[in-house]
Amino acid sequence: MGYSFDRASKDVVKKLQGRDLRPVECLSDATKFRLFHILQETPRSGWETEDIPVGFTLLDLLEPNFPVPEPEVSAPKPFIHVQSTDLEANLNVADIARGGVGYVGYGGYNIEVQSTSIPNPKLEILQNRKLLDKLPTFMKFCRMERKNLYVVTEAYEVSKDTMLTGLSSVNLLVKGFFKQLFKVRGKAGRSEKYSIPIPKGSVLAYKKQQLVIENNTCVILPSATKKKMTFPDRPLKLYDLPVTLRYQEEVIETGSWIDDIDPIGTIEEPANLNFMCLQHEVSEQTQLLAELSKDVQEVVFSSFLHMLSDRDVLYDLMKMLELNQLGHMDGPGGKILDELRKDSSTPHDVLKDLNLYLLQALLVLSDTQLCLLAQSVKMGLLPHQVELVKSILQTNFKYSSNTPFTLQPQLLAPLQGEGLAITYELLEECGLKMELNNPRSTWDLEAKMPLSALYGSLSFLQQLQKANSSSKPSLSPGYI
């Protein structure tokens, strides 16, 4: 597996074991999470929240000529990690051919990071400071949209230039029909080498504290817990909640989950409540997607296919939509923005929210998974993958401990050869231990969020592909 920037950031966060420490997921924004930078929190539906840097610091918003606290800087800490994956199997492929399938990957890093922080006592200098009379336009938008804002108070920066390296390869030993399909003798497949430079000063992880703005003054709360809204004069209403939370409120209010409670000791909460919410949300959003015109769905489908291999482009598009900035953007992302600017029968907010939903789900996934999704679309694997991931979540969502489970044979049957190798690697990247010769695995609580995002991504892409089934997707080599 290639070691991408977001994977390295998440790994460093685990090793630091800091409370409320969050990873930076996109290298292009790694300098926008430094001390005092302001972040807009955005829910990622059923999986998590995303912090979007707005391009301003707290110091840009406060009246000038005030003292600025001196940050505390730690000594550099080294982090070294090497990881490899090797999956091999001999499988029957629908009585057509016999061959070997394998996935081989390795990746790693050697990074030094140091923290810069402003402890709460030093933040007292900035408490209750007056804001500028004329604030940036994003502040008005955040107030109208009831968005919460945060300030970075601790950042872990790379102390010297470094490099992430790795390789991922899917190989298929082909015979019979597959020999003609791939037009080769022996092995067929794909491999990709990774080499990503990480410049000095890039932020891998950060801590944030919430801002409360009232009476033209700014208060920094002691933590990021949302005890108050950033703009208290704009109270949060039920219809402002994400779909998952609204549905959960309805389920709890009606008590429809009561009969589904399992015996004490197997779960931490009403059985399947969260999965019911997730399933309802994905179904509701997918239905809205299906109601778009075929032309609009074709634009969205082709645009996302060409963006799947480029996390930075996906992230930039998400930022523009989150901050309601519909300006110029090159490439396939620009086509989606063009659709949003059109005066069409599709409501602007509906189309924007649906694109955001898919973007937020995709950005939970690793770079390897994004490339594998593009290949899954091309091979027509999505319907089978949706059902497989759904069955894993439905069975294990309620468990907080490591629990063995077995993949259902009827769901694995359509996934043979390279399709099975791709699907297993998608699951492996979520945190499940998979072996191609073995349908058994063990549930890991940390896999819940990426699996949920994978379920949402697969469901959306399946609907888009279904709407575009009359024309086969054409992916240029640069996008796979």
Curated annotation (Swiss-Prot):
Cellular component terms (Gene Ontology): cytosol; plasma membrane
Region feature (Triggers pyroptosis): 1-226
Disulfide bond annotation, renumbered to this chain: none
Modification note: Cleavage by CASP8 relieves autoinhibition by releasing the N-terminal moiety (Gasdermin-C4, N-terminal) that initiates pyroptosis. Palmitoylated.
InterPro entries in UniProt: Gasdermin (IPR007677), Gasdermin_pore (IPR040460), Gasdermin_PUB (IPR041263)
Site features described as Cleavage, chain residue numbers: 233-234
The record's note on its domains: Intramolecular interactions between N- and C-terminal domains are important for autoinhibition in the absence of activation signal. The intrinsic pyroptosis-inducing activity is carried by the N-terminal domain.
The family this protein is said to belong to: Belongs to the gasdermin family.
Name under which the protein is recorded: Gasdermin-C4
Gene source species: Mus musculus
Lineage of origin: Eukaryota, Metazoa, Chordata, Craniata, Vertebrata
